[in-house]
Amino acid sequence: MQLSTYVRALWLALAGLFAAPTRGAVIPEDRADLLYHYYDGGGTTVSGPALLVRKGIGERVSAYASYFIDNVSCASIDVLTTASPFKEKREEYGGGVDYLYGNTTIGLAVLRSKESDYVANTFGATVTHEVLDGLTTFSLGYNVGRDNVGKVHTDFADHVNRYQYKLGVSQVVTKSLLMNLNYEAILEDGYLHSPYRAARLLGLSVPEAYPRTRDSYAMALGIVKGLGSNDGQLNASAHLRYRYFWDTWNIRAHTVDLRYVTRLGDRWLVEPRYRHYKQSAASFYADDFSTQMVFMARDRELSDFSSNALGAKASYQLFNNRFSFNRVTLNFDYESIRYDYTNFTDVRTGRLYAYKANVFQVFLSGWF
């Protein structure tokens, strides 16, 4: 069974833990990360380990490889109203290399994930370049993906082509102020919905019908402000990020992300955070259609809804310069999310649907 959009987003967030460096003129440090993640919300649980190792090759090249497992148990409202609860396993293999040339870093990456009814293959390339003594960094990114879509116990087969373009600029404004602006475009064509879901027409279940193309865009502005202590040293930072999303399905979305990072003593680094998200519904979405339409969807992720997330991350430095490691940290991350739907009802109760989700991660990181 195909995983929900949130689970895929969680996956991307975990992968971002091991992303290329933020500064183009320095290759990443050698490191290894072992992670366990757990998600529970809306009748779906996802858990599993992740492993990544990154190693420098000379002074200009850094290579990495990653492996993730998701064990999924799903009894979400979509499943309970249109199908049967299921269990699923998803695996992902990835790898990449970053090459440093002067003030420019070029990165290449490949990714393959596999479920019983969905196989995704992605190739990506990035370029970052620093100017003005590192005060300004420009970044470009391109990803191309080919997904194969199936349906268990049937011979159904289709595909999705995906092309992603990214542009970004980061500017050091003062010694304690950093700003960045990012643009993203994703062009998709193919089978863009789930073969398991159904729409409702006058209370009856009918097959969903989606457009076979979707273009989506996003702009994001981020601000990081360093905060000092009595001795004048920066030991904390405040982060603010706003993202606006729009697409050709008439969805409009706003995201506001606030976080605060500070040190507690010599070993602890803590990061409380809050995120608000709100989106409008797709033009062909309805909770219950009154007449037959060319395109018809009842995916709650295309409806009008909002979410509020409150979380915190804590990192504890275990030791330095022992067991062949320069530094080892133990990290914990927890987030509680509340989803509220404006025009999606639970057909079992007739009430507007809402649910809470909990996300927990624990990982061990070592630099060598």
Summary of predicted features, one role per range:
Residues T22-E29, R60, N103, L132-T136, ...:
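Short loop/turn motifs that connect adjacent beta-strands in outer-membrane beta-barrel proteins
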Residues T45-P49, K89-Y93, L100, V119-F123, ...:
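Residues that define the transmembrane beta-barrel architecture of outer-membrane proteins
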Residues T44, S66-G96, L135-R200, D215, ...:
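Outer-membrane beta-barrel translocator/channel fold
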